[in-house]
């Protein structure tokens, strides 16, 4: 779903290399393939996650804990974006990323780290919008609108009542605050 959404937002087909438990999903691979994986297969010499991460701008992880190493992160392009969203433990921790990359933007699915990626940020509002317009399905345009609204909200000043819910944290747009916190109205 994530890759389909970013492709709907304009990422070219060849701009994403997907991996599963057997490695890179590439044109010509036979092991473990199905119609959904085949739809995202690309022409590449990369065969492993480590290969795919060399020079990558972005990593979206939705797999298992500790599947990304510091060496993989170090091999990425400048200013990499790393969304390690496996729960309860991410593919790589923010501490491990910061140890090798001070320029990285990092997000996880955990509330005890900055930039928590959590469906609580989108579901109530997407459903409210769908109900308001009597939509029978939630389409890409709705998902894109929600993503853009969250991005805009993260750039706004954080209200005092939200700051009070997060004592001691600096909540302002930057590497450690690209996603609003759940209590932001």
Which residues make up each language-model segment?
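Ser/Thr-centered flexible coil motifs
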Residues: 32-34, 69, 139, 159
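Glycine-rich phosphate/diphosphate-binding loop of Rossmann-like nucleotide-binding domains
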Residues: 1-64
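Intrinsic disorder and flexible coil segments
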Residues: 10-11, 23, 50, 55-57, ...
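Short glycine/serine/threonine-rich phosphate/pyrophosphate-binding segments
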Residues: 1-5, 26-28, 66-71, 90-93, ...
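Rossmann-like adenosine-cofactor binding region
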Residues: 37-105, 110-112
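Adenosine-phosphate binding glycine-rich loop
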Residues: 84-183
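Surface-exposed beta-strand edges and their flanking turn/coil or helix-capping segments
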Residues: 31, 74, 119-122
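Alpha-helical scaffold segments in soluble metabolic enzymes
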Residues: 1-8, 51, 55-58, 71, ...
